[in-house]
A protein has these predicted regions:
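Short N-terminal helix-loop-first-beta-strand/juxtamembrane motif that initiates sensory/input modules
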Residues: 1-13
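Acidic, low-complexity cytosolic segments
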Residues: 11, 16-164
């Protein structure tokens, strides 16, 4: 499982702002960015990548920004996981962390690192660290949920073997 935070840069278009653990395969990156670039009405959606045997579970949301055109930053949390996992097990955690990101004061500054007139703002580095911490916490919670779900599935399979 991997977790990515996507950001819509109004100058260059969609980009993967942060992923954990490590980077995401180039072919998968292109697909995720393509889905983020679509005009979606649903905030929560999944995409099956049949050839890759993966599933992308996505939650789109926006945060208020004093610096962005239209006063909002467009973001998406994406879980890249095995095709067999149900997207529903991830929803409440993705929602919880989208709310935490939306609620964090001035967190939009984390997206203005290079090439912006505001890059000298002393709060930028603090906000980058705060955002990374939130994403890592989200990843840990998703991992815990996945492990619990896998254990539950093992127990269910054992009980199904019994004849009642």
């Amino acid at each position: 499982m991997k977790l990515a935070l996507l950001y819509f840069n109004t100058i260059t278009g969609p980009e993967i702002y942060f992923s954990h653990p490590g980077s995401i395969k180039e072919s998968i990156c292109k697909k995720i960015l393509g889905f983020f670039d679509l005009d979606m009405s649903d905030q929560f959606f999944e995409v099956s990548l049949i050839e890759d045997e993966l599933k992308l579970i996505n939650l789109y949301f926006e945060i208020t920004s004093c610096w962005a055109r239209g006063n909002k930053e467009m973001l998406m949390l994406s879980v890249i996981t095995d095709k067999n996992h149900k997207s529903e097990i991830f929803y409440d955690i993705l929602k919880e962390y989208s709310i935490k990101i939306m609620s964090a004061v001035n967190l939009y500054k984390a997206f203005y690192v290079k090439g912006y007139l505001k890059e000298n703002d002393p709060e930028i580095e603090l906000k980058i660290n705060e955002l990374h911490t939130l994403i890592l916490e989200c990843y840990d919670k998703l991992g815990e949920r996945l492990n619990i779900n896998l254990e539950d599935e093992k127990i269910i399979k054992k009980f199904k073997k019994f004849e009642w």
